[in-house]
């Protein structure tokens, strides 16, 4: 059994597709099909076997699971999370990060004072966006780049941004 600390979320089932038990898989890997090169598991650490049927223009994967043959069976998979073992991931280059390692990191200002935490990392197609939850419980979305985040470590990020009063 694997703890969630040893697992990295790499995809989620968005919906059913067609009548043969196919599902729409939103992959968090780049490229999207890279998810299929990993040994995939569920939250309990049990192996998951997925077969690619096709990929749509949005980069979402249309897949099937070995034991799912009908739309009714596939309906229960909506929101199903797919993981891989952290130990199976490749080493990253400098200035590369896994989303799981950045989420919940403290956000510090230029004076190294904690002002919030990274709540989420989003991507709507034009680059990564960092959602920050500030100490006053408000949130803001900022582009994930060196201008806004000049220093990123495994323990915190520095934010170069002045909030409006």
UniProtKB/Swiss-Prot annotation:
GO terms for cellular component: cytoplasm; ribosome. An accessory protein needed during the final step in the assembly of 30S ribosomal subunit, possibly for assembly of the head region. Essential for efficient processing of 16S rRNA. May be needed both before and after RbfA during the maturation of 16S rRNA. It has affinity for free ribosomal 30S subunits but not for 70S ribosomes. The PRC barrel domain binds ribosomal protein uS19. One of its GO terms (molecular function) is ribosome binding. Residues 94-165 form the PRC barrel domain. Keywords: Chaperone, Cytoplasm, Ribosome biogenesis, rRNA processing. It is found in: Cytoplasm. It comes from Rickettsia rickettsii (strain Iowa). Coiled coil: none annotated. Belongs to the RimM family. One of its GO terms (biological process) is rRNA processing. This is Ribosome maturation factor RimM. InterPro entries: PRC-brl_dom (IPR027275), PRC_barrel-like_sf (IPR011033), RimM (IPR011961), RimM_N (IPR002676), RimM_N_sf (IPR036976), Transl_B-barrel_sf (IPR009000). Binds ribosomal protein uS19.
């Amino acid at each position: 059994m694997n703890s969630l600390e040893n697992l990295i979320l790499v995809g989620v089932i968005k919906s059913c597709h067609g009548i043969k038990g196919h599902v729409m898989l939103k992959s968090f890997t780049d490229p999207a099909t890279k998810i299929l090169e990993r040994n995939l598991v569920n939250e309990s650490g049990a192996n998951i076997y997925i077969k690619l049927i096709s990929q749509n223009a949005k980069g979402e994967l249309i897949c099937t699971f070995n034991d799912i043959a009908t739309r009714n069976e596939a309906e229960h998979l909506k929101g199903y999370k797919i993981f891989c073992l952290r130990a199976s991931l490749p080493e990253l280059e400098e200035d590369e990060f896994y989303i799981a390692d950045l989420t919940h990191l403290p956000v510090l200002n230029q004076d190294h004072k904690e002002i919030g935490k990274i709540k989420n990392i989003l991507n709507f197609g034009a680059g990564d966006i960092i959602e920050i939850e500030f100490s006053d419980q408000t949130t803001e979305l900022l582009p994930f780049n060196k201008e806004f985040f000049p220093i990123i470590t495994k323990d915190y990020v520095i934010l170069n941004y002045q909030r409006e009063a």
